[in-house]
Structures are given as structure tokens and as C-alpha cells.
């Protein structure tokens, strides 16, 4: 506009996909380029948007924690806060479905919740399904495999040592299958030494190496993927029991605080694939004793038979940020 001088708008609020606040009092000019580029003019505003969520290390500088009043209409009603509180109280129904439209801020809110739980002394593992799985060919067994790996990761990180029977159960559960599969797709060995126990140095690290090979097969090898899925399908109750034993050992190590798992990217599944995974295997995916949060396609909540999942999962919806205009 001729004769119009653009005011300095750098200290103002700019919305990105996950509602990010720029707080001038906490803004460090020297670190300005480390996170994102702020708009200096109206023309720059589109370039200041970022489609990805805030990372945990960015929360302190950019996270804005007062969006619930414009999401739910009430600052004291928060689906994320409900899940946060529920995760801290052991319950028979400890699995959650988090629904929300793409870009509404689910991942950022989950990252913030995970950071707060960590401050409270809990161990959280974020499972990135978009990286670890082929989202075009999902099966419930894949989630149970990643669940087991997540628990072993937490156990290794916390110095937890599950009892020898549990270690032996996990080792034998997959050893028999990997012997049939042979060499993993990445060319690594799948064997573990006989006689390993919870006191053997590096035992959990060796289990994690085995899981790394299995994950590679789940994503890239159709033939081996079928073998692993069949093992879970035939012996899912045995695998869940082993996972719960590991979770119990972690809980004891953390003075009663249960491990918490968050499955990201499942809301990006084809709705029919997601329905096949969760509806047909609801009892299995919800049948664990520790808190698990699954992101979930919001479109499926409009199905008339969605209510059938309520008996297995606690579901919460993160609404979009609502805006009101003067006109």
C-alpha cells in the first residue's frame, strides 16, 4: 500500500501448525535462527509456518500452554490433561486413543505431556510408527513388537534388570523365529549367546540389537514380516505376559511409576487399515497393564460402531483451535 509503513511486528504472536508462542522476554537474538525464521513483514508470514511439531528441546522457548480455552471453550477442560493425570494412576483401563485433525497440535501436546511426566520421574518412550513401520501395510502384531522393544529400551535406559525367567522368555520367543527366518535383512546376526541372564553385561543391549533387525524386516522384508507376525498371532498372550513382567520390573525400579508408551503417526493410517488393526484386535492392544497412548484417525469416530471401542480404550479428542472474527 503506497505510503504505508509496516510496523515492527516481530514481538507478536505467530501461529504455526502447532500454535507456537513467541515470547519477547525469552527471545535470544543470537539463537534466532536455531529454531525457525520469524516474519518481519506480512509477506513473510507464510514462510514462518512450519508443518512439523515442536520438539521437546523447543518447548521451553516456543510452547504456548493456554490454547485449551479456544480449543474446548473452557480453559479447565483438557483432553491432554485428562490423559496426563490418568497415566499417573494405575488402572485396569490404561490404554488411550487420541483423536484430532491433522495439524491440530497432537504431537506438540504429547511432547509437552511427555516432558512433564519425565519431570515427575516417569519414563516415556515415543514410538515413531511412521519411521519404524510400513504404514501402508500395518498389522496389530507390528505394534506389539514395537511395544516390546520400547519396554526393553526403557529397562536398559533406567538400569532395570528383569528377572532371568523374563529375559529367557523374551530371548526364546524370538530366537525360535529368527532361526527359521535366518539372517536379517541388514545382514546382521540374530543369535544370542546361550546362558545369558539379567546379570550378564549387555544383555538388554543384545535384545535391542535383535529388535533392530526385526524392525528392519517389518519395514522392508515381506517374507520375514509374515514370520514375525505369525509368531505374535499364535502366542500373543505369552508375549503380553513377558512385556508386563518387564514393565513391572521397570515400575519397581522407578518406585511405583509405570513406564508410559506413546505411539505416534497412527492417525496417518488409511482409515480402513486403522479400523482393521484396532477394531479386530481391541482386546489385545488394550490388554496391557501399563499406560499406552495411540494416536488415531478422527474420521473413524463418526462410524456408528465406534462405540464398540469404548469398552477397551479411553478415547479423547484434541479439538482444533477455534477463531472468532469481528464480522
Q: What annotation goes with each model-predicted range?
A:
Residues 94-96, 100-256:
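P-loop NTPase nucleotide-binding core
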Residues 38-41, 76-79, 143, 235, ...:
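Alpha-helical structural motif
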Residues 3-23, 27-117, 121:
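Walker A/P-loop-proximal flanking segment of P-loop NTPase domains
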Residues 35-46, 67-92, 207-222, 263-284, ...:
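Short, charge-rich amphipathic segments
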Residues 9-11, 34, 44, 223-231, ...:
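The catalytic "switch" region of P-loop NTPases
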Amino acid at each position: 500500500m503506497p505510503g504505508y509503513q509496516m510496523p515492527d511486528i516481530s514481538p507478536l504472536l505467530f501461529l504455526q501448525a502447532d500454535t507456537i508462542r513467541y515470547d519477547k522476554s525469552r527471545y535470544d537474538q543470537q539463537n534466532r535462527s536455531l529454531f525457525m525464521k520469524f516474519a518481519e513483514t506480512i509477506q513473510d508470514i507464510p514462510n514462518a509456518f512450519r508443518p512439523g511439531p515442536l520438539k521437546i528441546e523447543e518447548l521451553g522457548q516456543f510452547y504456548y500452554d493456554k490454547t485449551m480455552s479456544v480449543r474446548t471453550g473452557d480453559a479447565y477442560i483438557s483432553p491432554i490433561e485428562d490423559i496426563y493425570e490418568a497415566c499417573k494412576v494405575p488402572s485396569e483401563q490404561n490404554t488411550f486413543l487420541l483423536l484430532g485433525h491433522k495439524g491440530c497440535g497432537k504431537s506438540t501436546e504429547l511432547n509437552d505431556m511427555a516432558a512433564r511426566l519425565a519431570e515427575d520421574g516417569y519414563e516415556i518412550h515415543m514410538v515413531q510408527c511412521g519411521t519404524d513401520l510400513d504404514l501402508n501395510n500395518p498389522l496389530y502384531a507390528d505394534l506389539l513388537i514395537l511395544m516390546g522393544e520400547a519396554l526393553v529400551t526403557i529397562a536398559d535406559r533406567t538400569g532395570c534388570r528383569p528377572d532371568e525367567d523374563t529375559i529367557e522368555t523374551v530371548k526364546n520367543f524370538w530366537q525360535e523365529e529368527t532361526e527359521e527366518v535366518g539372517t536379517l535383512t541388514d545382514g546382521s546376526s540374530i543369535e544370542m549367546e546361550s546362558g545369558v541372564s539379567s546379570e550378564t553385561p549387555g544383555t538388554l543391549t543384545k535384545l535391542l540389537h535383535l529388535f533392530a533387525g526385526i524392525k528392519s524386516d517389518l519395514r522392508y522384508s515381506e517374507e520375514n514380516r509374515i514370520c514375525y507376525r505369525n509368531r505374535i498371532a499364535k502366542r500373543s498372550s505369552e508375549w503380553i505376559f513377558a512385556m508386563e513382567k518387564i514393565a513391572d520390573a521397570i515400575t519397581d525400579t522407578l518406585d511405583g511409576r509405570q513406564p508410559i508408551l506413546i505411539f505416534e503417526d497412527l492417525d496417518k493410517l488409511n482409515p480402513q487399515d486403522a479400523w482393521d488393526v484396532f477394531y479386530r484386535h481391541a482386546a489385545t492392544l488394550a490388554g496391557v497393564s501399563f499406560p499406552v497412548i495411540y494416536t488415531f484417525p478422527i474420521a473413524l469416530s463418526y462410524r456408528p460402531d465406534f462405540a464398540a471401542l469404548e469398552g477397551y480404550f479411553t478415547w479423547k479428542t484434541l479439538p482444533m483451535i477455534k477463531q472468532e472474527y469481528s464480522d
